[in-house]
Swiss-Prot record:
Family in the record: Belongs to the NAD kinase family.
InterPro entries given in the database record: ATP-NAD_kinase_N (IPR017438), ATP-NAD_kinase_PpnK-typ_C (IPR017437), NAD/diacylglycerol_kinase_sf (IPR016064), NADK (IPR002504)
UniProt-listed SUPFAM superfamilies: NAD kinase/diacylglycerol kinase-like (SSF111331)
One Pfam family this sequence matches: NAD_kinase_C
Protein name from the UniProt record: NAD kinase
GO molecular function, one term: metal ion binding
GO cellular component, one term: cytoplasm
Listed PANTHER family: NAD KINASE
Protein EC: 2.7.1.23
NCBIfam families found in the cross-reference section: PRK01231.1 (NF002306), PRK03378.1 (NF002893)
Amino acid sequence: MNNRRFDCIGIVGHPRHPAALATHEILYHWLKARGYAVMVEQQIAHDLNLTDAITGSLADIGQKADLAVVVGGDGNMLGAARVLARYDIKVIGVNRGNLGFLTDLDPDNALQQLSDVLEGEYLSEQRFLLETHVRRTNQQSRISTAINEVVLHPGKVAHMIEFEVYIDDRFAFSQRSDGLIIATPTGSTAYSLSAGGPILTPTLDAIVLVPMFPHTLTARPLVISSTSTIRLKFSHITSDLEISCDSQIALPIQEGEEVLIRRSDFHLNLIHPKDYSYFNTLSTKLGWSKKLF
C-alpha cells in the first residue's frame, strides 16, 4: 500500500465513562512517545489535565492535523465527522460504544492496529454527506449536514404528517405517515435499517427514502441517485414539525417553509485497517450466519 503517512494526529471524542477517557490518555502518551505531533480536543485535555498538550477545537484539528482519531461510538464519530468533513483530513475511530459501524479499531488491540495505519497500511474511502435547507421564499435558509440520515418527524407528540415529495423538481409522491427517513449509504445500516430500508454498500452513489409508519400498504422505500435533489412541501402545518440530522441537530419547520435535501459538496475521508471488510463488519454487527464452507 502506497498511502501517505501522518505527522500530526488529532485526538477527538466526548468520553461518557472512565474507560473511554482512559483510552484517550493512553493514546496521547503512546503517540507522543513515538514522536508524533499531537493535538487534543480542548475538553479532553481539560478532563485529563494535559496542561502541556497542544489543544484546539474540532475545526482547529481539521485545519492542522493529518489524521483524527475519534474515540467513542458511532454517535461521537457522527458529531466529529460533520465538522471534519470540511477539511482535508483522514479520520479513523476507536470503538468505545455499542454497535460501531464507523469505529473500526478494537480498544483492546487499537495501538497495534493504529501502528500499522500510521505506517501507511490502511484502506481509504470517501463517504458523502447530505445537506439540508429549511427555507422560505426570499429568506435565508437554515442549513445543516448529516453523515447518516435526515429525518422528517413530529416535534413533540407523535402524529401523522401529510406532505409531498419532489425529486429533481418533479412530483414523486404524496404521503401520510409518521415521518420520512432520507439516508446515505453510510446511514442505511442505522435508523433507516430499523424502519425496513435496504442496506446500500458505501460505494453506491445513492440515497434511500424510507417512510415511517405510512398510512397505506403501498408505501415502500425508494432508492434514487445521490445527485438528485429532494424537496418536501407541506400544504399546511398544524403542529410542531422538525428535520433532524443524525439525531443530533434539529431544525424546526414553520408554516410556509419547505425542506430541500441534496448531496453535500463535503465528504468524509474515512480510513480502515488494512484487513477491513465491509461485509465482515455487516455479518459481525448484524449477527448474520457464517460461511458454510
